[in-house]
Amino acid sequence: MKNKVLLCINTLKSGASILGNDVKVYLETKYFVEVVLIDVGRPLFSFPKENFLFLITLGGDGTVLLAVNLLLENENIDIPIISINMGNVGFLADIKIEDFKKVIDRFFNNSLVINKKFLLHVTVSQHGKDLISKYALNDIIIRSSVLNKMIYVDLMVNSESFLSYKSDGIIVSTPTGSTGYSFSAGGPILEADLEGFXLTPISPHSVYNRSFVFSKLSKLSISFSKEYFIAAASIFLDGINFGSFGVDVVFEFKISSQSLNFVSFCTDTFVKRLKNKLL
């Protein structure tokens, strides 16, 4: 039986199909592996329940997040992730197109450098019963299911009552996700290897409107204030809507003991990459 490689491409990206074929041919002819191709730019109805040597993504950071969601949903998170950038910013997809052969060669020569990226875990419970238990690489967002409605939430840290927010939503982000939506909402940028996570309100209408950074040992609990009523709130994990919930639910956040294995090929420091991509 041949070894298999999972190749996730976003055909909505110009040139992705052509590059995908080049990668596929290179793997099949030089290393005699079977390439399983998935187009994350189109609806996916099934995920191959197989073991893969590694995952390659062709696209931007959005493509990486879609592919990661597939891995997380199918509990297949141990394989190395090679993310080739066809987008703009490229914090997650940071391998240049012209380097894809070198990276593949390094895998088969056992000379890859792996960066562990923390996962954020959330549990949504109602009356003590867990409704969902999910992981995110970038961020988890809670916002009203009704357009133009604010949410009123109470925050607890390690089972201790802390403060309340009135805002358009709440972003809980990992260091990986701190350069995305959280940053746009005024949140802090966390160094990639920092063992912690951040909470940032979206357009807060509260007297206290600042973000917080918590250690990996902290556990956050968010519930809806009993003083104000909203019909429902939605939760988004890495941009994907995982449903709406009534106001009697509790959201619990913590850094997971599990992580994802991203292949590193960039020699730039975090500060240099940040300067080049954001500033």
Curated annotation (Swiss-Prot):
Cofactor(s) the record lists: a divalent metal cation
Binding site for NAD(+): 61-62, 138-139, 149, 166, 168, 179-184
Keyword Methyltransferase applies: no
Subcellular location, record wording: Cytoplasm
PANTHER family assigned to the protein according to its UniProt record, in alphabetical order: NAD KINASE
Record family assignment: Belongs to the NAD kinase family.
Name under which the protein is recorded: NAD kinase
Taxonomic lineage: Bacteria, Pseudomonadati, Spirochaetota, Spirochaetia, Spirochaetales
Gene: nadK
